[in-house]
Amino acid sequence: MGLILHKQSGRGYRALSKIFALPSKKTIMQLLNRIPINPGVNDVIFNNLAEVVSGLDESSKYCAVMFDEMSLDPHIHLNVATKEFEGFETNDDEQRNAVIADHALVFMVRGLVKNWKQPLAYTFCRSSTKSVILVRLLTKIITRCQQAGLKVICTICGNTCIQESH
């Protein structure tokens, strides 16, 4: 509950924390860091999504899968919790390679009838994502959304410039 309040309104959370015993921001961040979220399509996200979707009425299951790519500053980081270096290309969500990434591709699903949204997956790549990789990821994500009980009506792409296959 504290996480939901904190994400909805930081100011509101601070005000309520003066009245109620709510966890600190540090505690919330420590709890979030325990959730195993890695680049690619994550079972944790889709398992939780399926649980939530099972309680929705039929019209609330209509949704759009959205994706967009953004540039990043190339950077390598040691994740102390996993003892792995991060910042490398992971654009074929099954593989990681030694190329330093400078772009992130993010997938999200959003309700069309009811106003809800959920991040689904992300990958890192060098330059823009190649079209063959995007098709593979998009197919996998739409399939997983349908398996979770969602009714994907359309896809929406941001201003992504996709590389053609070489």
Listing of model-derived features with the role each one plays in the protein:
Residues 142, 151-162:
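Acidic/histidine-rich, metal-coordinating catalytic segments
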Residues 1-8:
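Short, amphipathic alpha-helical "recognition" segments used to contact nucleic acids or chromatin
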